């Protein structure tokens, strides 16, 4: 039966946001079309009828960009959208993180949330429209969901917070913050900032939450009218009798095992307990072996959380605000442009910095207005880092997300293109993992850039904070390790310099957190960050003064934009000839800035001289040292510089009359001449006569002066 179409609207951050329900995608469990400005996003939510036999909740969130939304045709031969862009992947994660904690515990039905950008207005964020659409699609559906949630982007210009700023406003802003949450609490934060103090970041988060409350109230009105009755679902529960039996036989030994400080020894002890219990119950056909494993893992989680919240004891024995042992090194790889190794306990990251010409920038093909990217940070997480085997695949969402977080943290201190005309690529290889690998990669990448001689504004370090909340007990943890991340309630990553925050990322597994928790986490993170920066500065306290001998050397010059065509030549013949002669790379900007790069400084200079000669303009009144290239009866043609000749008329060769040019010059002679005129046709007239006259008069004055002195 057709649903009735409903439309709702609200003024949100200075633009109209409207929601349409009941017209599109009616076979989905829930579907809404969100319009924000000229942006239009269709969000749908569907769920399987039966639960899956899995130990986790199978939720998939996809944010899909259609290039027709921006009036573009995809590039390449196939001419259709391929794999999602990095921006689309990051937005999918951005939507997934705040909605995932709001499904019922034990819910195992397959849920898929899809948002398709159908019209893109760069001044009206499609990401925020998709987040609201995803929340509403779930809320109006029959899928169990404890929403709604909403998200907002917060900027700050001249000390004032701006909600959902335009790209132009974000360029001026010192904060680019996305915050999401429910009516009661915040449950997701993602931010980049220009060394902003912690208290300002906190106020920005809270300002965003106030705006979120208005959007949630709007969604609740939509759900009142359009919401379906929630279906009855089968939640996964454990057999009470089996749980009691396992608690009696294994709980005590598990409590001992989780107190083992070393990661692998602790995990081996837990694995042995689980294997013994599985063996003990394997003959009983009424018992599901997988359920035995899940119950025992639940006991591990309970004990770890109890120790942290009640006894303030961490799995490795550290204090709640204690950082694991630190180590920082540089220059491990001699042929790379820069390298840094950062180790924190059993987490280790090796980062390599590579410098390239501006022609090496990444070209972006998406809905965004940004066409290229000069600074890149890539993150790799091989299986050996956790002592396991596994297939080697292309980077997944996690790797892309961690790489982007590091990029956001570091790009705030990258020098401008004018200060440092290089493309910068960082690759972080995680060699050991026991939590906080993304933050270790930030530290290692800072070391690598300083080793490479990149003049960063300040060193950046990152640290991951955790939270475990059990009943009335709550503990904020500094520098969480793998087990604390997996079994805790919050992963709050904070990166920054000694002056302030450059990036934040917060994910939580509970419904939300309040101001007090955020304040405490930010303060502990600041203290931890300062300790880490101190350790890093022992390895290298400032960027190297010179680049690696293996890094390209770049020369910069500026030419008249009207002369760019002279440097490029017809079909690129001129510029290709220069490149062939010198072996350099040449990049020319529309404003006339020319970048010449190669490993050979001499070849850079040669290419620069060729280009300067090509674009050099003759100036009337200037004196040039030229060469006679052609002799005619009426005068000599003199090459002033490559590509530019002038006529030295026979009457302008000498002060006295001469009969033949050949009486004074032969081909190849070098001569000083002055430009006396450039006519309407661009022809250059020269004179040697005026220079000879000036020299004679100067000599006569000096002789007269000498005579007077006698």
Swiss-Prot record:
Where found, per UniProt?
Cytoplasm
Q: Where does Mg(2+) bind?
A: 485, 491
Query: Residue limits of the KH domain?
Result: 552-611
- List each copy of the S1 motif domain by range: 621-689
**What does this gene product do?**
Involved in mRNA degradation. Catalyzes the phosphorolysis of single-stranded polyribonucleotides processively in the 3'- to 5'-direction.
Q: Which NCBIfam families match?
A: polynuc_phos, PRK11824.1
The protein in question is named Polyribonucleotide nucleotidyltransferase
């Amino acid at each position: 039966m057709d649903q009735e179409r409903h439309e709702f609207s609200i003024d949100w951050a200075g633009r109209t946001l409207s929601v349409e329900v009941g017209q599109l995608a009616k076979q989905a469990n829930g579907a809404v079309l969100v319009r924000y400005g000229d942006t239009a996003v269709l969000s749908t939510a569907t769920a399987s009828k039966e639960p899956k036999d899995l130990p986790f909740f199978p939720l998939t969130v996809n944010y899909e960009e259609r290039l027709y939304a921006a009036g573009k045709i995809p590039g390449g031969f196939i001419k259709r959208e391929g794999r999602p862009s990095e921006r689309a992947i990051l937005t999918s994660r951005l939507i997934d993180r705040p909605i995932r904690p709001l499904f019922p515990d034990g819910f195992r039905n397959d849920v898929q949330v899809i948002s398709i950008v159908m019209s893109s207005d760069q001044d009206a964020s499609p990401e925020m429209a998709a987040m609201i659409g995803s929340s509403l699609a779930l809320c109006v559906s029959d899928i169990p969901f404890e929403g709604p949630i909403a998200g907002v982007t917060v900027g700050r210009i001249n000390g004032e917070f701006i909600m959902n700023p335009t790209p132009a406003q974000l360029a001026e802003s010192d904060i680019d913050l996305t915050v999401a949450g429910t009516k009661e609490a915040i449950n997701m934060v993602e931010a980049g900032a220009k060394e902003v103090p912690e208290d300002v970041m906190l106020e920005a988060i809270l300002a965003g939450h106030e705006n979120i409350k208005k959007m949630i109230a709007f969604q609740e009105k939509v759900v009142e009218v359009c919401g379906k009755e929630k279906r009855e679902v089968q939640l996964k529960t454990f057999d009470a009798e089996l749980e009691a039996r396992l608690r009696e036989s294994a709980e005590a030994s598990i409590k001992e095992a989780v107190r083992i400080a070393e990661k692998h020894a602790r995990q081996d002890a837990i694995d042995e307990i689980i294997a013994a219990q599985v063996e003990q119950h394997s003959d009983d056909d009424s018992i599901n072996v997988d359920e035995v494993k899940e119950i025992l893992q639940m006991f591990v989680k309970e004990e770890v959380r109890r120790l942290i919240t009640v006894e303030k004891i961490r799995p490795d024995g550290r204090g709640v605000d204690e950082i694991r042992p630190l180590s920082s090194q540089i220059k491990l790889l001699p042929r790379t442009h820069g390298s840094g190794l950062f180790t924190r306990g059993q987490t280790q990251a090796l980062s390599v910095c590579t410098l390239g010409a501006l022609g090496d920038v990444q070209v972006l093909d998406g809905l965004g207005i940004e066409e290229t990217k000069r600074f890149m940070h890539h993150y790799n997480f091989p299986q050996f880092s956790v002592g396991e085997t596994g297939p080697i695949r292309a980077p997944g969402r996690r790797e892309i997300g961690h790489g982007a977080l590091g990029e956001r943290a570091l790009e705030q201190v990258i020098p401008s293109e004018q200060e440092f005309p290089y493309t910068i690529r960082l690759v972080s290889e995680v060699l050991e993992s026991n939590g906080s690998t993304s933050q270790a990669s930030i530290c290692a990448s800072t070391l690598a850039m300083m080793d490479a001689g990149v003049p960063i504004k300040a060193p950046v370090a990152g640290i991951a904070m955790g939270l475990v909340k059990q009943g009335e007990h709550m503990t904020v943890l500094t520098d969480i390790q793998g087990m604390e991340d997996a079994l805790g309630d919050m992963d709050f990553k904070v990166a920054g310099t000694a002056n302030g925050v450059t990036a934040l990322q917060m994910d939580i597994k509970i419904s939300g957190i309040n101001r007090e928790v955020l304040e405490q986490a930010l303060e502990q993170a600041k203290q931890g960050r300062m300790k880490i920066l101190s350790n890093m500065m022992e390895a290298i306290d400032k960027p190297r003064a010179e680049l690696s001998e293996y890094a390209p050397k770049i020369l910069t010059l500026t030419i008249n934009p009207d002369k760019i065509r002279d440097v490029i030549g017809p079909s690129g013949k001129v510029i290709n000839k220069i490149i062939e002669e010198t072996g350099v790379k040449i990049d020319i900007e529309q404003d006339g800035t020319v970048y010449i790069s190669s490993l050979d400084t001499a070849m850079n200079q040669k290419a620069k001289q060729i280009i300067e000669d090509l674009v050099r303009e003759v100036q009337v009144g200037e004196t040039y040292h030229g060469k006679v290239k052609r002799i005619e009866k009426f005068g000599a043609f003199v090459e002033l510089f490559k590509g530019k000749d002038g006529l030295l008329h026979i009457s302008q060769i000498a002060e006295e009359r001469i009969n033949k040019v050949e009486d004074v010059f032969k081909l190849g002679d070098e001569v000083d001449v002055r430009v006396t005129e450039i006519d309407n046709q661009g022809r250059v007239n020269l004179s040697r006569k005026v220079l000879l006259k000036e020299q004679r008069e100067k000599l006569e004055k000096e002789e007269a002066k000498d005579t007077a002195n006698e």
